[in-house]
């Protein structure tokens, strides 16, 4: 937890925010459990895998943290074959409606694989990515205050 506010932001959310910046942790690694160290190792591997996309891709701010309880960022490769969307919700909401997040910067004629679905760029940019969570006020692991999720989009060729 933060030593001043005693809030405990999950390691997943810390990493999901840090990927889009300088990728660092503000914590005492000596205080981490073995499980937390293993989680951080996986997060570092993820960062290494997508480092060039985060560093050299085109960045979009999809939702501003200053206008609602949601923030969303996106980075798209220059050839528009892959993208990563970061969605962040600091405070849990109860009984919220069905939500979609319109994306930016994709190729409207390319098909992208995301969340087990194949969707065209024009659909993702005009209709949006489904971002509703399934908690609906229930206490589920990983869904609550300081919730975040990354969506990995990869181009899917028609014959694949």
Predicted feature descriptions by range:
Residues 1-123, 139-143:
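Active-site-proximal substrate-binding groove within the catalytic cores of carbohydrate-active enzymes
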